């Protein structure tokens, strides 16, 4: 309570129930008397928790509110005091019923002087003499209380129920109206302050239902209507329709307060009854957010014919209906507040939506000016305006919300629509906000307009998020929660949102694509939707890169990683330096790590990679395949001499030539081919010297010559991990194969060393012992099963096979071989998945057949687990005889065995093997359908691996310490010892400087990192702007083409109708009953039928109507009268009324406009209106 900042930091708690001391006050106020206390709360608190005044209780010698001033001689006074204390202790909000607190936080209108004088007289009767401090505070609180809070002497019970104003005789209409307005004003003042304490203290189920039953009558009396209520599916509490969304969003955030006990409430009532004062408690109903409350102003009664007037575009009728509805409802500025039913609220919403959808902007302005729509109606109207692509209407709606400063819409409140069940009937899916819809439709103008107003799309929480918002949303409606996430991601992954809401649109597309790919794995039920959005992000990055216009922009885009991705795990190792003169290409390598195949396979990226790959060898790309093979063969033969030359002089002309990526690739490939040749040589030597290798007479070095290359490979992989980083190293599956191969080689070599060591140890002391003979001269037939040489030879055989398969790493350098290599990789994945099903079925039949034939042992291939497995395995390939399962002397086991063997053959050979073939074919076809992208992506990864600085010398020459390495080591030691300043530690640029917009050819060598980053962002924004302009031009062109197609169809329709109308005209002129031709259209048949139906009504038609014989295009409306009068003439519609419901539009020819063209009567009942 009384705690300074020093005490708070040191943990000295000075709170407690005690009297104030002089040390608790400041020095100027020490020793002085005081009659009031001012409390300042400086500790932070959340808006969802009750304001911390419930713990405050002040007592003094003059009296206390907790101990009412009662005559000591009165019976039961001690009991009243005790009960009153219990009330404050058990009441969850004792400070709300405190008159002093209510006077400070909830000021009310003044009461009448007569009531105050009566209360003052009662207080003097209770306490003769001058009034005490408690009596003065009660009197002051009564002055601020509403008239209904003071109980007359005739009614001293203070029971809850209707107030004195309600029980009295009804007054005139105008005073009642003023009283209602006063109550509304008091509610407006009280609600913001009341929300500090009870905005999030939501009741539990039992308490919530009890309070709702208590509050419903009061709400009904205040509003004058029935308030619709809904049940929260989370806590099962009843709340009004408007407060339910806000409650559901924060339900369960803080523990509900405990209600006061009945005994305490009764004692409190007795105390108030003794004072003859009843303070009306404020209803603690959770107040909704201002964004979801109805705008308090005049509410019009919905006219039934308004929708028809809007549909027909009759502006005057709409204004007349709104004015008449306003007069009929009496909802002027001073009129009573009337609840609007849900159906009527929906009608107003449909009226506004219809006006927007039909494009009647003037009618929309009239509705917005005369009708006060709440946030939900404006929200749906915005969606309709965005859906119909009307930026002007969107501006009007946003301006309407902007003018309501007191109820200004918070853009975060759009998420509360999830908990609003009143908009479930909307045509828009859950989670669709105006900005989300605009982005989904790629409406750049509307999206930019909404973003300028502060609208954003909040990124959904992770799938496994267990926060209060996500848990409440799942419990409220799981389907709406899932659809809301999908629709939100549709908006985020749209081209408009990526272009307008991201500073680096390309990087945002990469990161979002990776996130959507992960969500597709975590939420397989929505995998197709996530995969489609991920493909959309890849296409956006591909198209954005295509907006580059010069090499400077390409260099700026591909060479910078981006500040937002520097902390990403996939960006590890992307800051490494490349060879001298080779740009960093950090953005391109990030795209490779993010698996952006479309972006990497873009012609711009491939051109950059190909130019770096060839280096100064300009003629390499245009040379023939024979010449390339000849150069590769020369490098293969001279590989040792080239490596020695580079080792001696790395900065010479030969050294710079070997640093070119394509030559480095050929050099390393030649080294690996030499390694495979040595492996083949060792195998051939073992065949020629079989007697030597059959026993233990060979030495370790004779069988381990390949370990020279293995040592070089091990050092190469260590340097690669050091340069790239462990995570980036493990992202490549070929590195896993390298680790396995090296591990097996080292294990084989270690076993041979172990064998040699054991032979030396056992033969050192006793050379003629049995153990020494076993490890030196024993024959192979005498070796034990776990002999080290057995294991070493087996491991070496497996490793040799894997070493040859490692040669497939260089196949992506060729287009045809690279595509086959990718297809084989996909097929291996299919086979691994297929093996799970295969092993399940094979194990099932293995157990069944083995259990049948074990007791009989009639066959060598059945009855034993290992033999049965081999028999079934080779049966899949048709290499076993079916007579093996025969047992003539045992009919029942033989029948079951044959049946099981037949079923196994059908399932494995016919079903599963064909299914495997279909899977492999499908994978191969997928690669072939996108072979160009797949091959270019694989080739790009191969190219990038040879762009790095270092690793120029191939295996095994890289294990030799080079003079360059020694020079770098000495220079690093010298810098560490002699130059420890920060200037020496400054990192150089990883790529050459780039030009600027003003001078693309200039070298920005002196430009800082900030200028380079700024230039990159300017390039990205320029690309985005070009992309937006291109999208707009394509949209306009598509719309023009669509309009042209419609005009062409309209022209054909007019030509066809011309002939039909001419035929009708000829028949009418002949005066007979025309018969429609067989090929006549529906319109022609309809006109003919109308003429035949009314041929005997009205005056005759002239033989040659002037308007039908004039060529030209005119739109004619043919309508039937709604009824006939007594004379047989068609009844004309009254002015202002809509036309007939049955109408048809006919296009006829006209040569020139007829002045004052009016209605053309056909047979008196066929009415045509011509418009030029």
Curated annotation (Swiss-Prot):
It comes from Mus musculus (Mouse). Residues 206-218 have a biased composition (Basic residues). It comes from the Eukaryota. Its main location: membrane. Residues 1-22, 69-98, 140-227, 249-271, 1118-1172 are annotated as: Disordered. The gene is Trpc2. Residues 261-270, 1130-1144 have a biased composition (Low complexity). Residues 1-659, 724-738, 811-833, 921-1172 are cytoplasmic. It is found in: Membrane. This is Short transient receptor potential channel 2. Coiled coil: none annotated. Thought to form a receptor-activated non-selective calcium permeant cation channel. Probably is operated by a phosphatidylinositol second messenger system activated by receptor tyrosine kinases or G-protein coupled receptors. May also be activated by intracellular calcium store depletion. Plays a role in mediating responsivity to pheromones that elicit aggressive and mating behaviors. Required for response to the Esp1 pheromone which enhances female sexual receptive behavior and to the Esp22 pheromone which inhibits adult male mating behavior. It is a multi-pass membrane protein. The chain crosses the membrane at residues 660-680, 703-723, 739-759, 790-810, 834-854, 900-920. Keywords: ANK repeat, Calcium, Calcium channel, Calcium transport, Ion channel, Ion transport, Membrane, Repeat, Transmembrane, Transmembrane helix, Transport. The keyword ATP-binding does not apply. Isoform 3 is ubiquitously expressed at low levels. Isoform 4 is expressed exclusively in vomeronasal organ. Residues 1-10, 166-177 have a biased composition (Basic and acidic residues). Disruption phenotype: Reduced electrophysiological response to pheromone mixtures in the vomeronasal organ. Mutant males and nursing females are docile and fail to initiate aggressive attacks on intruder males. Males display normal mating behavior towards females but display increased sexual behavior towards prepubescent females even when presented simultaneously with adult estrus females and also show increased sexual behavior towards juvenile and adult males. Lack of response to Esp1. Residues 681-702, 760-789, 855-899 are extracellular. InterPro entries: Ankyrin_rpt-contain_sf, Galactose-bd-like_sf, Ion_trans_dom, TRP_dom, TRPC2_channel, TRPC_channel, Xrcc1_N. One of its GO terms (biological process) is mating behavior, sex discrimination. Residues 75-87, 195-204 have a biased composition (Polar residues). Belongs to the transient receptor (TC 1.A.4) family. STrpC subfamily. TRPC2 sub-subfamily. ANK repeats lie at residues 301-330, 377-406, 430-459. GO terms for molecular function: calmodulin binding; damaged DNA binding; diacylglycerol binding; inositol 1,4,5 trisphosphate binding; store-operated calcium channel activity.
């Amino acid at each position: 309570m009384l705690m300074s900042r020093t005490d708070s930091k040191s943990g000295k708690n000075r709170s407690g129930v005690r009297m104030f001391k002089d040390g608790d006050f400041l020095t100027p106020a020490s020793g002085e008397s005081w009659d009031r206390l001012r409390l300042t709360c400086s500790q932070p608190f959340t808006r969802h928790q009750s304001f911390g005044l419930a713990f405050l209780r002040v007592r003094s010698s003059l009296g206390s509110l907790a101990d009412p001033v009662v005559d000591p001689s009165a019976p039961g006074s001690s009991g009243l005091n005790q009960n009153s204390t219990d009330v404050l202790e058990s009441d969850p909000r004792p400070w709300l019923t405190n008159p002093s607190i209510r006077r400070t936080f909830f000021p009310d209108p003044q009461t009448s002087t007569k009531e105050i004088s009566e209360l003052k007289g009662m207080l003097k009767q209770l306490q003769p003499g001058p009034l005490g401090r408690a009596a003065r505070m009660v009197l002051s609180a009564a002055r601020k209380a509403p008239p209904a809070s003071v109980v007359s002497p005739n009614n001293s019970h203070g029971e809850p129920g209707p107030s004195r104003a309600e029980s009295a005789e009804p007054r005139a209409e105008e005073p009642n109206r003023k009283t209602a307005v006063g109550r509304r004003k008091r509610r407006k003042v009280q609600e913001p302050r009341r929300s500090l304490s009870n905005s999030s203290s939501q009741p539990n189920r039992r308490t919530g239902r009890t309070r709702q039953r208590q509050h419903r009558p009061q709400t009904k009396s205040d509003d004058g209507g029935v308030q619709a209520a809904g049940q929260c599916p989370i806590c099962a509490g009843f709340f009004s329709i408007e407060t339910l969304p806000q409650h559901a969003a924060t339900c369960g955030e803080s523990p509900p307060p405990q209600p006061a006990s009945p005994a305490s409430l009764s004692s409190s009532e007795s105390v108030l009854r003794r004072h003859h004062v009843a303070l009306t408690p404020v209803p603690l109903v959770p107040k909704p957010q201002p964004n979801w409350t109805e705008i308090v102003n005049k509410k019009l009664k919905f006219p039934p014919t308004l929708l028809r007037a809007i549909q027909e575009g009759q502006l005057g009728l709409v204004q007349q209906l709104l004015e008449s509805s306003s007069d009929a409802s009496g909802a002027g500025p001073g009129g009573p507040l009337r609840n609007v039913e849900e159906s009527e609220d929906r009608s107003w919403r449909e009226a506004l939506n219809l006006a927007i959808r039909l494009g009647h902007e003037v009618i929309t302005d009239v509705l917005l000016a005369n009708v006060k729509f709440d946030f939900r109606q404006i929200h749906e109207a915005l969606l309709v305006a965005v859906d119909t692509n009307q930026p002007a209407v969107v501006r009007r709606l946003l301006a309407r919300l902007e003018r309501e400063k007191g109820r200004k819409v918070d853009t975060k409140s759009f998420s509360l629509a999830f908990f609003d069940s009143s908009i479930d009937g909307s045509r828009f899916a859950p989670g669709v906000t105006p900005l989300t819809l605009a982005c989904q439709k790629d409406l750049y103008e509307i999206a930019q307009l909404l973003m300028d107003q502060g609208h954003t799309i909040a990124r959904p929480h992770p799938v496994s998020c267990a926060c209060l918002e996500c848990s409440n949303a799942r419990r409220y409606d799981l389907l709406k929660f899932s659809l809301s996430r999908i629709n939100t991601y549709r908006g985020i992954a749209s081209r408009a949102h990526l272009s307008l809401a991201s500073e680096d649109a390309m990087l945002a597309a990469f990161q979002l694509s990776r996130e959507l790919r992960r969500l597709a794995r975590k939420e397989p039920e929505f995998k197709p939707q996530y995969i489609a959005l991920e493909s959309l992000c890849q296409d956006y990055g591909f198209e954005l890169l295509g907006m580059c216009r010069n090499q400077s922009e390409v260099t700026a885009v591909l060479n910078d990683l981006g500040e937002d991705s520097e902390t990403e795990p996939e960006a590890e190792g992307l800051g490494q330096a490349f060879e001298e003169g080779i740009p960093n290409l950090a953005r391109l390598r990030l795209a490779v790590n993010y698996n952006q195949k479309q972006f990497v396979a873009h012609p711009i990226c491939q051109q950059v990679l190909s130019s770096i790959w060839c280096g100064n060898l300009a003629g390499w790309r245009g040379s023939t395949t024979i010449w390339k093979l000849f150069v590769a063969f020369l490098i293969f033969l001279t590989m040792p001499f080239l490596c020695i030359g580079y080792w001696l002089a790395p900065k010479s002309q030969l050294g710079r030539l070997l640093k070119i990526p394509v030559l480095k690739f050929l050099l390393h490939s030649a080294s690996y081919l030499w390694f495979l040749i040595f492996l083949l040589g060792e195998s051939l030597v073992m065949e020629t010297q079989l007697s030597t290798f059959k026993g233990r007479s060979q030495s370790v070095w004779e069988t381990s010559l390949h370990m020279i290359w293995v040592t070089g490979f091990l050092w190469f992989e260590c340097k690669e991990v050091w340069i790239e980083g462990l995570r980036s190293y493990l992202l490549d599956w070929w590195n896993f194969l390298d680790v396995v191969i090296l591990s097996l080689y080292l294990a084989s070599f270690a076993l041979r060393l172990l064998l040699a060591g054991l032979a030396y140890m056992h033969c050192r002391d006793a050379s003629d012992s049995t153990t020494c003979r076993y490890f030196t001269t024993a024959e192979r037939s005498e070796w034990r099963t776990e002999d080290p040489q057995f294991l070493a030879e087996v491991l070496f055989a497996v490793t040799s096979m894997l070493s040859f398969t490692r040669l497939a790493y260089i196949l992506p350098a060729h287009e045809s071989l690279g595509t086959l290599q990718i297809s084989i990789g996909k097929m291996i994945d299919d086979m691994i998945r297929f093996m799970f099903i295969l092993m399940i079925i094979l194990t099932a039949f293995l157990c069944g057949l083995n259990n049948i034939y074990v007791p009989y042992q009639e066959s060598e291939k059945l009855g034993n687990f290992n033999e049965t497995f081999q028999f079934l395995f080779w049966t899949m390939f048709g290499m076993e005889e079916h007579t093996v399962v025969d047992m003539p002397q045992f009919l029942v086991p033989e029948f079951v065995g044959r049946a099981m063997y037949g079923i196994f053959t059908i399932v494995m050979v016919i079903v599963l093997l064909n299914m495997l073939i279909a899977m492999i074919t499908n994978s191969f076809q997928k690669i072939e359908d996108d072979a160009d992208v797949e091959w270019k992506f694989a080739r790009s990864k191969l190219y990038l691996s040879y762009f790095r600085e270092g690793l120029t010398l191939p295996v095994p020459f890289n294990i030799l310490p080079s003079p360059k390495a020694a020079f770098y080591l000495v220079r690093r030691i010298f810098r560490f010892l002699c130059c420890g300043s920060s200037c020496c530690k400054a990192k150089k640029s990883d790529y050459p400087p780039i030009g600027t917009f003003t001078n693309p050819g200039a070298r920005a060598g002196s430009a800082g990192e900030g200028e380079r980053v700024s230039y990159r962002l300017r390039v990205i924004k320029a690309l985005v702007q070009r992309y937006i302009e291109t999208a707009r031009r394509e949209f306009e062109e598509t719309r023009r083409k669509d309009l042209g197609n419609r005009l062409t169809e309209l022209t054909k329709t007019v030509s066809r109708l011309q002939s039909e109308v001419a035929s009708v005209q000829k028949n009418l002129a002949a005066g007979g009953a025309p018969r429609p031709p067989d090929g006549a259209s529906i319109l022609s048949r309809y006109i003919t039928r109308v003429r035949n139906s009314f041929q005997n009504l009205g005056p005759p038609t002239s033989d040659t109507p002037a308007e039908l014989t004039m060529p030209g295009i005119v739109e004619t409306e043919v309508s039937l009268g709604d009824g006939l009068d007594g004379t047989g003439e068609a009844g004309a519609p009254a002015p202002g009324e809509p036309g007939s419901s049955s109408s048809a539009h006919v296009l006829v020819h006209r040569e020139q406009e007829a002045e004052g063209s009016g209605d053309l009567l056909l047979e008196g009942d066929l009415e045509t209106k011509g418009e030029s």
